[in-house]
Amino acid sequence: IVDVGPEVSERGRKVISSFVRENQEFDDLEHFIENVRKYDPYRSREHIERTVKYNMIQRVDGKFVSKCDSNPRRAGAQGQMAEKDNVTLEEARSFDFPVLILRGETSNILEPDAATRFRDALPQGQLIEVPNCGHNVHSQNTLGFLDAVVPFLEGLN
């Protein structure tokens, strides 16, 4: 489980929602790239440019927009739907299998104390804090992500 849990930071959610809302369309891709660099300082410019190449399209009016429909995120529907689908700490106590929780060192979504409570609720829970990344562990520190996940997977029967 990567940087989420039964208790997610509302402050962090608002930061992400705000970024999505404020970055809907652009006249110039460079403007979007600079916004992403400010928002996500762990990602290299090359990585952001590659992401932009595959995830943005230019409309007939010349504006650049995401290929993904962001309306549910803009409307806040995603957060409301996710809330009712979240596993509670009480439910986590019944998970009778190994669970690895990864938390980004500077995550604004899964706070350290919430990650610890989640791990403690899991009978076979492990928690690893991956350095040099925030919420997007896999893309902000891919090697750190793999260093955590591979041994866990290799240890499963």
Model-derived features with residue positions:
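Conserved serine/cysteine hydrolase catalytic core
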Residues: Q58-D120, Q126-E129
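Flexible "cap/lid" loop of the alpha/beta hydrolase fold
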Residues: I1-H31
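Residue-level signal for the nucleotide or nucleotide-sugar donor/cofactor binding architecture
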Residues: D27, L110, Q140
